[in-house]
Amino acid sequence: MKSLQTICLLFIFIARGTSDKCEICHGFGDDCDGYQEECPSPEDRCGKILIDIALAPVSFRATHKNCFSSSICKLGRVDIHVWDGVYIRGRTNCCDNDQCEDQPLPGLPLSLQNGLYCPGAFGIFTEDSTEHEVKCRGTETMCLDLVGYRQESYAGNITYNIKGCVSSCPLVTLSERGHEGRKNDLKKVECREALKPASSD
């Protein structure tokens, strides 16, 4: 995977908490410091998200604090197995002020392949991405397909296409997505049962 894709993806999934002002920042590591900004409706919640791209034993982590609509807060915890052994993990925490607490990002579980598989994709700046087969592990019994874009002043429109194995489906749906002042739009959120290999008989 290209390093540019890795850096850009670290700042895609964001959230916010109910407040007049929220801290705005993004950076590598577990925390960041920034500036206060008023949060107009519908982006009227403060939030903090940790994004981790993990290829055991190495991981790249970033933090983003911003104002967002409550629909994105429903993403909560997302662990997507996008390539064999490669995970994109996000922890979104919304709160009523700009000091949102972290949700834990424990180490990747050691689990065996469970015989299921999903289409996998990891695309940035495009809604199209070449698919490959991801062999699901452990409790990963669902396939997630996520397409959307995020508008940021530092990077413009970041379009993304992410597919892979997940243990559970995120609560957010397209009917609840909201356009967040045209800054964030989920164009596709599909979650279905993982596939079984075709019988050799």
From Swiss-Prot:
Keywords: Disulfide bond, Glycoprotein, Phospholipase A2 inhibitor, Secreted, Signal
Keyword Cytoplasm recorded: no
InterPro entries associated with the record: CNF-like_PLA2_Inhibitor (IPR050918), LY6_UPA_recep-like (IPR016054), PLipase_A2-inh_b-type (IPR016338), PLipase_A2_inh_N (IPR004126), Snake_toxin-like_sf (IPR045860)
Entry PTM: Glycosylated.
GO CC annotations on file: extracellular region
Superkingdom to which the source organism belongs: Eukaryota
Tissues showing expression: Expressed by the liver.
Transmembrane spans: none
Leader sequence residues: 1-19
Keyword Signal: yes
Cellular localization per UniProt: Secreted
Disulfide bond annotation, renumbered to this chain: 22-46, 25-32, 39-67, 73-94, 95-100, 118-143, 136-165, 169-191
Pfam families found in the cross-reference section: PLA2_inh, UPAR_LY6
Gene Ontology MF term list: phospholipase A2 inhibitor activity
Residues carrying covalently attached carbohydrate according to the record: 157
Function: Inhibits the enzymatic activity of phospholipase A2 (PA2). Binds to the major PLA2 toxin of D.russelli siamensis (Daboiatoxin, AC Q7T2R1, and AC Q7T3T5) at 1-2-fold molar excess of inhibitor to toxin. It exhibits broad spectra in neutralizing the toxicity of various snake venoms and toxins and inhibits the formation of edema in mice. May bind to PLA2 through its proline-rich hydrophobic core region.
Subunit structure: Homohexamer.
Family the UniProt entry places it in: Belongs to the CNF-like-inhibitor family.
Name this polypeptide is given: Phospholipase A2 inhibitor PIP
